[in-house]
Amino acid sequence: MRPILLSGHERSLNQIKFNRDGDLLFSVAKDKIVCAWWSANGERLGTYSGHQGAIWTVDVSPNTVLLATGSADNTVRLWNVKTGECVKVWDFPTAVKRVEFNPDGSRLLAVTEKRMGFLGTIAVLDISYGDSQGGALENQADEPSLRITCTESKATVAGWSYLGKYIIAGHEDGSVSQYDGKTGEQLENVQAHEFDHQINDIQFSQDRTYFITASKDKSAKLISSRNLAILKTYVADTPLNSATITPKKDYVILGGGQAAMDVTTTSARQGKFEARFYHKVFEDEIGRVRGHFGPLNTVDVHPNGTAYASGGEDGYVRVHHFDKPYFDFMYEVEREQLRK
């Protein structure tokens, strides 16, 4: 697996995202710039500039028409993917830590930071796709259609379950909440991780019926969207920043590493700066991919399961296209199932 090294950022990566087709990869970092890349060869398509602060989060609509970003300049910006122009800016009282489109792209959630006397909130914005020619994308609602306020522990990440039925949020205290996608009422709250070890990432399976969390408590959990039942636990030896579920094969990929301030030796091995592959069903670690010089902040997998990308504290994005052995690898039990 020879990685493609994408260097377009001057500072550490915050989030990377493949689009629904998997031909594009979007990356955001602490340097105010959004980059778009061809995922097949790592060529840079272009950049989206306009933010005034570090960009924490990015998401692309299912039809790859709009791109949303959330930043430390307290705004959510909506971009036209094709032309690179900013079509809408929403202002918030505090920084925006996570944005995500619902499965049909008609709504966008934004998680805001708890700061300066403002409580952390999850705001839902209605998204319009203009006329049939793709014009008039500027006509977006000015105010959120729904606001969920996190009175107890602030939400750090959030996402939509299947059909946009629930909003699932991960919190600073290690708990996971389920909210009604229409009314915003809290239906369920589960202490999924150790108390006060915040959840750094939530990523869903392709059908959005379950999701994986990555936490500072050095573990990742597979959780059902319907009732927040914990299905599987993957234990690592380092705090985790990101986790993703691979389609096609039953694996999960975890990314982490010691926080930059805790690193005492800079050997790539020492800080445990590798992407770890675990078997989704059996919870065993099956391999690691090295390469980053610093913690992995974000991992994402190609929607066809043919490649994955990781973004690190070192400012690089690495795209790995899987080789044949990756797809051929099976446990003995899996082979027996096939023989039947």
UniProtKB/Swiss-Prot annotation:
It comes from the Eukaryota. It is found in: Cytoplasm. Coiled coil: none annotated. InterPro entries: eIF3i, WD40/YVTN_repeat-like_dom_sf, WD40_repeat_CS, WD40_repeat_dom_sf, WD40_rpt. GO terms for cellular component: eukaryotic 43S preinitiation complex; eukaryotic 48S preinitiation complex; eukaryotic translation initiation factor 3 complex, eIF3e; eukaryotic translation initiation factor 3 complex, eIF3m; nuclear periphery. Keywords: Cytoplasm, Initiation factor, Protein biosynthesis, Repeat, WD repeat. Disulfide bonds: none annotated. Signal peptide: none annotated. WD repeats lie at residues 8-47, 50-91, 150-189, 194-233, 291-330. Belongs to the eIF-3 subunit I family. Component of the eukaryotic translation initiation factor 3 (eIF-3) complex. Component of the eukaryotic translation initiation factor 3 (eIF-3) complex, which is involved in protein synthesis of a specialized repertoire of mRNAs and, together with other initiation factors, stimulates binding of mRNA and methionyl-tRNAi to the 40S ribosome. The eIF-3 complex specifically targets and initiates translation of a subset of mRNAs involved in cell proliferation. This is Eukaryotic translation initiation factor 3 subunit I. It comes from Neosartorya fischeri (strain ATCC 1020 / DSM 3700 / CBS 544.65 / FGSC A1164 / JCM 1740 / NRRL 181 / WB 181) (Aspergillus fischerianus).
